[in-house]
């Protein structure tokens, strides 16, 4: 995703500046990106940045009135009301809109960036103090990769920028690779690459004279964990107050904003309290372009948009995406630095189209994880015989690491571990195309949720919040039939049917057991997939890999380069590919993983 990039070094300028140029170019992915550089030899700072044109972060660098502080900021910040007015009263010169106030917050607030609210990364160069401070948000969602060498400290929003100037780092880290196979992400601020790490959440690392002096942290999760729990009613009232008061911050700004609606609760809570004027907020939903049926997300989202008097459209995944799958597969892995597998390749396609509607996408992301403590990832063991015995210990170790992470506070797991490790990859991919917003990582909201009693962790709080904001929206069933206001027999039966198809679709697609795959193969002339697919999901990779994408799967996975990877067992991989393409076996998850690993090799590890 767009962000800061560069090096802090004692190297002479004629050596450091060419490296900076290559690092910036490594992040220039789109024609709507803008780039810049700022160099201060006295500080040993060679700084670059990439931003989407007209986004909050466009227009860097920021300077104070004395021009002895330079700040470069990437991401978005959602300040308290009155912040800019207060700074003007203090005598600062700044624009009413945009990020110019941030450099003055740095001057005024000794704890900067502790007071910032949002997902961000940045760097402050202070000539008066002769310091450089590299910082990120308290959740670590706007990731900064780094590498420490003997002569330089490299940092970048994407790992590929560091690989561009330090090719010796194009080596897979076995522990990171094992975690990616087992959990779908790399944990504990490691990466897939040896020698490249991730800046921990809430970092403020200070450099002087080209050298790292202090690895500072401006926030400790215990500050929120050690709060006194609230009683159920007090918690609800506080949650309602914070959510309703802070929500409008996330709709500020000069760019056009689109609402990404789903059939669930979290985007509906936003609509219930935003109360947009008629036809003022473009709404859209990602849907299945296969022509079978409108998925439940689309059906429910259309009802919500209609109730709010907003225009709604469907962005489908269909033949256009499938015809260019190899392009989107490669770009998904490349743009995310291998942090997501090919399950999310449709998301790149969809967000390209969403940008055409609006360059800012409002979502309900992270609502279920924060408010209802949903666990979005866990370790899983691969099919026996696919990976070599030498590599299996790294996969097993991932499960032990994960188990240790669950020992702390469940909200801390959700926002300080699950969010920056598991959710980061999709966020990074989507933000290559547009600015993604969600009110569910708001500082005040998350702080409040840490005080939730155990009785307030289900759907009831969210349903009540919707009803208090807009009683009409409460009446609309969710994509899975949930509606807290109606307990009739017909409502229960309706929800049961939707739950059946929700689970049946998973079982008929990527989750199909091997015995069922053999039956499906015998019934294939009758196309039983038409009965089950398209109810809840807009992608159907088991069938796609078997049919439309079979040539791509065969070409990639039976290629001698793939079969020769030392951690793979060749014969088992060949048997899996042939079984899946024939149709009497289901290895969707394994094909996802091995295809992604192979693309990581070809794009990052084999490339020099």
Where are these regions (language model features)?
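Cysteine-centered catalytic environments shared across enzyme families
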Residues: 1-320, 328-329, 595, 601-603
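Adenosyl-5′-phosphate
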Residues: 1-7, 41, 164, 195-196, ...
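Conserved glycosyltransferase catalytic-site signature
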Residues: 98-102, 117-120, 174, 298, ...
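Glycine- and acidic
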Residues: 224-233, 257, 283-288, 331-336, ...
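Glycine-rich phosphate-binding loop signature in dinucleotide/nucleotide-binding domains
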Residues: 252-254, 354-358
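Short glycine-rich phosphate-binding loop at a beta-alpha junction
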Residues: 257-259, 360-363
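Catalytic metal-binding/acid-base residues of hydrolase active sites
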Residues: 266, 366-367
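ATP-dependent adenylate-handling ligase core
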Residues: 287-350, 368-386, 403, 410, ...
